[in-house]
Amino acid sequence: MIDKSAATLTEALSQIHDGATILIGGFGTAGQPAELIDGLIELGRKNLTIVSNNAGNGDYGLAKLLKTGAVKKIICSFPRQADSYVFDELYRAGKIELEIVPQGNLACRIQAAGMGLGPIYTPTGFGTLLAEGKPTLNFDGKDYVLENPIKADFALIKAYKGDRWGNLVYRKSARNFGPIMAMAANVTIAQVSEVVALGELDPENVVTPGIFVQHVVPVQSTPASAAP
């Protein structure tokens, strides 16, 4: 019997090792798997490379992980916000490495990994500092820069509901990077508000099929993470 549901955060996260590359879903705090991140902090893993759209907000979620010093590098498109002071302090002190990737390129590079593609050409970033040292190509009169896929050891994502086969449905904007990140990791761990019985999820509403998910863990979101 296929049963990908995990009883505890520790059970779901136990495979994560030091030095892992981890995709973390979310657009700011919307769709951020805060409880999975808290569980990762408790495990005490270190030398992590994190791939996410942002670099954390306040002292919550991803910022909380950064504050522990467990992250050696972050790959993101929007590292600085009014409340990104944790990342800002670490970066200015030389305690974290940053790779900035334009948001569209970030999504495309993750998608490329999930689809099993090799490097992709994109016009975004050509002629800027972000393209330095990368191969370029002129195609049909337009210049492109070559970008590598972003493949990860693990993906931590947040969905609305899931079943024991790993099928997931999302809620509104919380969906964001979740579906493509689930495809681009060797192991995908999804936190959900509820694990429902097989057949309860309308197949037409399933966005991420279970083939891309290895663990589903139900969590009760804290007030700070209760929003989509």
Curated annotation (Swiss-Prot):
EC number: 2.8.3.6
A Pfam family recorded for this sequence: CoA_trans
GO biological process: beta-ketoadipate pathway
Top-level class of the enzyme under EC nomenclature: transferase
Subunit organization: Heterodimer.
Assigned protein family: Belongs to the 3-oxoacid CoA-transferase subunit A family.
Record key words, sorted: Aromatic hydrocarbons catabolism, Transferase
Pathway membership: Aromatic compound metabolism; beta-ketoadipate pathway; acetyl-CoA and succinyl-CoA from 3-oxoadipate: step 1/2
GO molecular function: 3-oxoadipate CoA-transferase activity
Catalytic reaction equation(s): 3-oxoadipate + succinyl-CoA = 3-oxoadipyl-CoA + succinate
Protein name per its UniProtKB record: 3-oxoadipate CoA-transferase subunit A
Binding of CoA, residues: 25-31
Alphabetized PROSITE patterns for the sequence: COA_TRANSF_1
Coiled-coil ranges per UniProt: none
Species the sequence originates in: Acinetobacter baylyi (strain ATCC 33305 / BD413 / ADP1)
